Amino acid sequence: MVCALSLLDACSFNQTSTSQFKEMPCDGWSKEMPIRFLPEYADSSLNYDIKLAIRHNTSYQYGNLSLVVDLIDSTRIVHRNNVDFEVSDGYGNWQGSGFGALYQLSVVIAQDIKPSDVSSIVIWQAMMNCNNVKNVTDIGIIVTPSKS
């Protein structure tokens, strides 16, 4: 019985990984609307990797999505990333995972960080050539323990 419980525990979901997603307005994501996340770290003694994830539907009009991502400690921006998601290939095929009308892509924006290094993340869609990006359904972060 103890062996079976140990095996079950070893196969259980990793409790130290967290994710947060924010739904985007149906009428589009405005350049003037930054998205802010407060990463949740399950164990302050571990180092973490953070991924930025986007979800879009098949009505998204562009081949890419270019974002500015600020990693902020308690007082200042510690790192600014320009992140470019290739949403579709040159033939118009959607990239990432998904089915039906919804797709998700993710990219690592921080690796092997201590929880005290990043207390908030702000995402801007300032790099796109339009004021309002439509058909991005959700923006999120995925925080997982570093493997290194």
Regions found by a protein language model. Name each.
Residues 44-52, 111-128:
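Noncatalytic modules at the cell exterior or secretory-pathway interfaces
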Residues 36-54, 63:
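Contiguous beta-strand segments within globular domains
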Residues 12-15:
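Bacterial signal peptide processing site
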Residues 7-10:
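C-terminal motif of bacterial Sec signal peptides marking the signal peptidase cleavage site
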Residues 20-40:
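Post-signal peptide N-terminal segment of mature Sec-exported envelope proteins
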Residues 56-59, 103-105, 125-134:
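Short acidic/polar inter-strand loop motif in beta-rich domains
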Residues 82-112:
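An anionic, turn-rich surface loop/hairpin at beta-sheet edges
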Residues 61-67, 135-138:
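Short coil-to-beta strand junction motifs in C2/discoidin
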